[in-house]
Every structure is written in structure tokens, then in C-alpha cells.
Amino acid sequence: ERIKTWPFMIFVVILTGVIYPIQGSWVWGAGWLSEMGFSDFAGSTLVHSTGGWAALAGAIVLGARKGKFGPNGQVNPMPGANLPLATLGTFILWFGWFGFNGGSQLALGSAADASAIAIVYVNTNLAAAAGVVVAMIMTQLMFKKMDLTLCLNGAIGGLAVPLIDKLKIDDVVGAISAHLVCGIWGTLAVGIFGSGQIVTQFIGIVSIGAFVFITSLIVWSILKVTVGIRVDEEAEM
């Protein structure tokens, strides 16, 4: 809605063709983080946090929408224009998680594999459902009414939107809260509740986050200086 198409596509190519494979090889390519015992079964850090760090860098360089933040720092609501379509998209994503998360087991040839996938399916559904319920309760307590967009983000996993707004970062689709924040939590949770080591998990989060964020910030800044990344004010409005 405020970014030029071609600079965005250039960044997508660099992210998927350069940044993502490098940090992915550190874990899934038997790299140094894998040797340390860092655990990321389905991509909490390698997929979700990576996208979140890249989105954070882009949002900082791009700047907020016109009128999003007032002169005194107040946040002006700018709700989406098609909530039914957003709701449909959330449920499509919810359904797709079963293939994405379950498929990370990479095998279905034994009872142990089937049992592991069943646990993944149950946890996936419970996590999304719990996210919706918590978002409904929290928005009712905080805003005196339920907010559909935050409830949808709750299913994906994010209630950090108010914090992002306070930092004056305009994240239209909630990518930072839903993917970055929850990706970090998902990775730490392995060290807290699972078989991973909390220190190793933290090292992985920091190292991958620093690499992706700094690299993305450099790429976005170069695109901004060379070809420009923001549409003119008339097109934005």
C-alpha cells in the first residue's frame, strides 16, 4: 500500500536467494548452530523470525503510512478494508499449517513417525485455537470490545501489535508481531519445555536475528537510495 512493487520484488529475490539459504544452512545444513545443538523443527526462527526481522528492517526504512501517527505520538486506527477476506485467509493459513508443520517430520513410514505427526497436528490446532481465545479475552479487557483483526492475528500467534505501535513502527499486516515475536518465543519454548538447551536456543535467535536484520537493513537502504522504495503521496492516498 505504500511500497513500490519492483523494489519489493528485488528484496524478495535477495531474501529467498541469499539471506534465507545462508542462515538456513547454519541449522538445517549441518552448520555451526546445528553442531551446537540448536533445535528448530519447523522453522520458528529459520522461517518465521527470519521473515519478521526482514519485515522490521523494511518497516523502519520505509516509514509509516501518512496519518498513522499523530503529531503528539497518538496512534490513529487504520483498519483493513476487507475483513471477511482477511478472515478467510486466516482459516486457509490455519488449514495449511497441518501440511507445513506435519510435513517437517519428513517421514510417515513407521508408527513412531505417525505418532509424532499426530502430536504436531494436535499442538498446531490447540495453539491456534488458544491464540484466538486469548486474543478475544485480551482485546475485550483492553479495548472494551473484541477486535477481529487482533483475534485473527491471535490465531497466527501475535498480540504484540500494541507494542509495535508504541515503537512507532507501522506494520500493516502484523508480520512483526505474528512471525518475529512468536518465532522467538517458539524457539525459546523448546529450551524451556523441550529437549533443547535454553542458552543454545538464545544464541541461535540472536545470531540469526542479527544477521538477517542487519543484512536486510542494508539491502532496504540501498534500494531506498538507488531506486526508491516508496510510492508518491498521491498514489499512497
Description of each model-found segment:
Residues 1-237:
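Hydrophobic alpha-helical transmembrane bundles of multi-pass membrane proteins
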